[in-house]
A protein has these predicted regions:
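Active-site helix of classical SDR
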Residues: 39, 75, 83
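Short, small/polar-rich loop/turn modules that mediate ligand/substrate recognition or access, typified
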Residues: 91, 96, 151-153
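Alpha-helical segment proximal to the catalytic Tyr-Lys
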Residues: 44, 88-89, 149
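Residue(s) in the substrate-gating loop at a strand-loop-helix junction
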Residues: 59
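Conserved small/polar residues in nucleotide/adenosyl-binding loops
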Residues: 169-174
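A conserved structural motif in NAD(P)-dependent oxidoreductases
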Residues: 125-136
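Substrate-binding pocket helix/loop in short-chain dehydrogenase/reductase
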Residues: 15-16, 23-28, 110, 121
């Protein structure tokens, strides 16, 4: 395996004071431990061959946090820590490790959002739309290519300029 893409992600949203240990643990197990379990088996071969590309799909919410997503944001921030550490460990062995932090992308996860919530999100994306999966795929393809051989420990933020916009909820969730 020359290129590995770790793309684990589930949501179990709840405000922190209502979050259950089960919600916390399920998200940690999938989003963080899943990344470890995806990369760890192929890492020795990359080291032996002195070549490898590790790409982790994190999230805008791992960069900025998000109301009701303490568990998800923690895992996606943890993914960035994994990338930065692996970049340092792998650099002398020809291995790069980078992340892509998508904003809201037209996936099943986003399609399951209530319509009003999605409208509010789109209203806060300066590009005026959610991203498309192929836009993230092109970021991954670039990071896997020879054109990115000196890019290591970096993050591509693909979010339509949404980076530090906060979504405010007006429900009784708080």
């Amino acid at each position: 395996v020359d290129v590995v893409v770790a793309n684990a992600g589930i949501l179990r949203d709840a405000p922190f004071h209502r979050m259950t240990p089960e919600q916390w643990n399920e998200v940690i197990a999938t989003n963080l431990t899943g990344v470890f379990n995806t990369i760890h088996p192929v890492w020795p071969g990359m080291r032996e061959r002195k070549f490898g590309r590790v790409i982790v799909i994190s999230s805008i919410n791992g960069q900025k946090g998000q109301f009701g997503q303490v568990n998800y944001a923690a895992t996606k921030a943890g993914d960035l820590g994994i990338v930065k550490s692996l970049a340092q460990e792998g650099a002398r062995n020809g291995i790069t490790a980078n992340a892509v932090c998508p904003g809201y992308i037209a996936t099943e996860m986003i399609a399951s959002m209530p319509e009003k919530a999605l409208e509010a999100v789109i209203g806060q994306i300066p590009a005026g739309r959610v991203g498309e999966p192929d836009e993230i795929a092109r970021c991954v393809a670039f990071l896997a290519s020879d054109d990115a051989e000196f890019i290591n420990g970096s993050t591509i933020s693909a979010n339509g300029a949404q980076f530090f916009v906060c979504l405010l909820y007006t429900s009784d969730a708080a």
